[in-house]
Amino acid sequence: MGMVSRYADMPPVIIKPRLEDPSIKKASANTNRILQEIGENPVALNTLAMEQSKLRPLFKDFDAENVSPEELGDFGKQLLAFGLVDNLTADLMGRAALEFDKDGKITHPDVKINALEFFAKRIDEMQTKVLTGDKYSKLLLPDYIKTVHVMKNLQVFASTGDSYGTMALNKRIKDGEKIKDELLPAKLKSKV
């Protein structure tokens, strides 16, 4: 009998590197870890009131991972004007920038950034400072976390047009649960 080698007559394999879209900026592993640590807060932004007021057209272009500091500040001002966020959250959204000039103004207000990554880095820095006893960081940390929750909720609302409550009710209906008509928003009444 002849000897059989596992390397004999194998067809050649060519591995091509996957082409990636340079416009897509991926978050680092540290950013993803921090975002997972702070979790979700579906009630950080009252998207049900936004849904009922039909505010989706104002926010339909919102993408927290690809937004300029100027746009993020405008979105924060709009949320503040409708009474959906407090002044500090709107202010934090308006100050998300990588570079400032000597007068404290944003140097490149139209350059797109990943706002979630920006805030995750600040949260990481603050968590480190809190461990060393920095009281100012300890005071501001919850506000930065709330701002991330608001941006995440706004991104879901902008992409789907639904509030967290509507999405939860929709899931319950799909699972076969019977819900009274008076508890349902108008667009879900037809699904029951």
Which positions does each model-derived feature cover?
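Type III/flagellar secretion export determinants
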Residues: 1-192
